[in-house]
Amino acid sequence: MLFDSVPSYITGMFGLMGIAAITKKRGGYTNTKMHGILAWSGIILASAGMYAIYQHKNNMGKPHFTTWHSWTGLSAFGGCIGLGLVGGVVLHPDFGLDTTNKQIRAIHKYSGRIVLMLAWMATLSGLKTLVGDDIKPILLFAVPLVVAAPFTLL
């Protein structure tokens, strides 16, 4: 039952991460703080999804992390947590250790784009596993990602 909610958690994470990316592009103190809040909200949703997946595998007696989909998803999840920690500890506008370091900011920015692309790949490969050769659901999910890509990745 909990496993059925995984797509909602992961889609919610995408929505929050996309909005967080767009919010940050506008710049400024308030947008930077909102970027962190939205991103960590997305991480919390993704955590619920990861928990549901892990418990589902345990309940079925299946091994964990045996597919490209699972490793890509785990990499994206770990990347989100790492970026969130760097953002919160190093780049936070109120108490960050090095808020003006342009190199750290650039690494954070481009790493975020890579992690978001990994998350998209994991989600699309998971959807492909669920729907098989039916291309319509994949297109319905992928087209909004393609439309949103210029706003979140560029």
Specify the residue positions occupied by each region the protein language model found.
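Membrane-embedded alpha-helical bundles that constitute the cytochrome b-like, heme-associated redox core
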Residues: 1-154
